[in-house]
Regions:
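Short glycine/threonine-rich loop-to-helix capping motif typified by GTGT followed
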Residues: 219-227, 288, 343-350, 391-396
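Short, hydrophobic beta-strand segments
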Residues: 304-308, 349-356, 389
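Structural signature of FAD isoalloxazine-binding scaffolds in flavoprotein oxidoreductases
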Residues: 45-64, 116-138, 164-171
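Glycine-rich N-terminal segment of FAD-binding domains in flavoprotein oxidoreductases
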Residues: 8-103, 112-118, 338, 378-385
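Short amphipathic alpha-helices in soluble, non-transmembrane regions
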Residues: 320-325, 365-373
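Activity-critical C-terminal alpha-helical subdomain
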Residues: 292, 363, 374-408
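C-terminal substrate-binding/cap subdomain adjacent to the FAD-binding core in PCMH-type
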Residues: 111, 129-317, 321-324, 328, ...
């Protein structure tokens, strides 16, 4: 069946057949032709949209085993994070390195080496014990940090190029409660930001919202910690869909600067009035999923997310430059989030994601983003990218961080 396949941000479309094998025999047959492996289609970029047949792994959705004593779960690659949480949260377990969307598949998380809100070891690779894939000879291949280690690292962040992931064994965090205490810390300049940077060492979770509408360097540290005392352990799902009429009305407003100003002001105000609050961990991990179809608000024009990595010493210089060039070209970011990443003991990096609404200016956005990347030699997350002209193939398998080289 031919379907119109689109990415999550409605910026890439292709009319192709989607095959959904139910077992290894059917999967092997499909793999003999040129193909692209897809999961839940939640990528912001175009990395899962190929020119050949599309193979969905969503029928490989079984939870194979759960060891509550050791905090270990084995799942098939098509299992969604939401399905895992339904089972693990009532048992006092959680995958604490989780992306902002709970409807992603395990295979998608691993193939993109996703990051979460953790202050330390903020990549899914740190939670993976082992992976089983179907290799180029159509044989099941087991790999881990100890066995087939090189292969293991190629699979993580490899976007299905090494072979489809069949299953994975993941390490879960033990929790006493389904609640997280979130605290907001405001800063109004770069010196304040530096004073608060110590927060990443004393909190389990920490991200930074940056006010991209102001010329000065201001924003919020949003820190979180699990409640230590025993409490309720319930899964929560009060997600809902917006009706078509509301989506249609919002689609005319969402890509305007007025909407962006209002949204960011309300976000800042809500965290200023209530600087400390206790929330359910599902609401903390996945705030955007309260509205299941929120991305359809952007269906009319789409939006892009520019997600890049850099060293902390360059933070102020990069953000100042981006704000300046955005202002000169009448571009703006709906939402800006800064994350912390420990690549190794000697290598610590930050990442910044900017949601940029499209208003018949996609070519301009692409031109400006490429200029920023090349000027500051940034690294990018291809799961979010649809803007870049050229990649350096030497870094293609560097665990989800891809360096850009100048286009000749």
């Amino acid at each position: 069946m031919n379907l119109v396949l689109n990415n999550f941000t409605y910026t890439s479309f292709i009319k192709k057949k989607i095959s959904k094998p139910k077992n290894l025999k059917q999967l092997t047959k499909l793999l003999k032709k040129k193909h692209t492996i897809i999961g839940s289609k939640r990528s912001y970029g175009d990395s899962f949209i190929g020119n050949y047949s599309n193979i969905s792994m969503l029928n490989f959705d079984k939870i194979i085993d759960l060891n509550t004593k050791e905090g270990i779960i084995e799942v098939q690659s098509g299992t969604t994070l939401d399905s895992i949480n339904k089972v693990t949260i009532p048992k006092g377990l959680i995958l604490d390195c989780s992306p902002g969307c709970k409807y992603v598949s395990v295979g998608g998380m691993i193939s993109n080496n996703i990051s979460g809100k953790l202050s330390n070891k903020n990549y899914i690779i740190n939670k993976i014990i082992s992976i089983t894939i179907l290799d180029k000879n159509f044989k099941l291949k087991y790999c881990s940090q100890k066995k087939n280690r090189k292969f293991f690292k190629l699979v993580i962040g490899g976007r299905g190029k090494v072979g489809p992931i069949i299953s994975a064994v993941l390490k879960l965090k033990k929790i006493n409660s389904d609640k997280i205490v979130q605290k907001a810390y405001h800063f109004n300049n770069y010196n304040d930001f530096n004073k608060n940077i110590k927060l990443i060492k004393v909190n389990e979770y920490c991200v930074v919202w940056i006010n991209f509408l102001k010329k000065n360097f201001s924003g919020l540290f949003l820190c979180g910690n699990h409640l230590n005392y025993k409490g309720s352990l319930k899964y929560k799902n009060n997600d809902f869909k917006l009706p078509s009429l509301i989506l249609s009305i919002l689609s005319y407003l969402v890509n305007t600067k007025t909407f962006t100003i209002l949204f960011n002001c309300l976000f800042r105000l809500s965290n200023f009035i209530k600087r400390e609050k206790t929330v359910h961990l599902v609401d903390y991990y996945f705030p955007q999923n309260k509205i299941i179809n929120w991305n359809e608000i952007f269906k009319k024009n789409g939006f892009v997310q520019f997600h890049f990595y850099f060293e902390k010493k360059n933070l102020l210089k990069i953000i100042t430059y981006i704000k300046k060039i955005f202002d000169e070209n009448k571009l703006y970011s709906n939402f800006a989030i800064l994350k912390f990443h420990n690549i190794s003991k000697k290598k610590n990096k930050l990442s910044l994601s900017l949601d940029i609404p499209i208003k018949n200016n996609f070519k301009l956005i692409k031109k400006i983003v490429n200029k920023i990347v090349l000027k500051h030699k940034l690294e990018v997350n291809l799961a979010k990218d649809i803007l870049l002209n050229n990649l350096n193939n030497k870094t293609l398998l560097s665990n989800n961080i891809f360096e850009i080289k100048n286009k000749k």
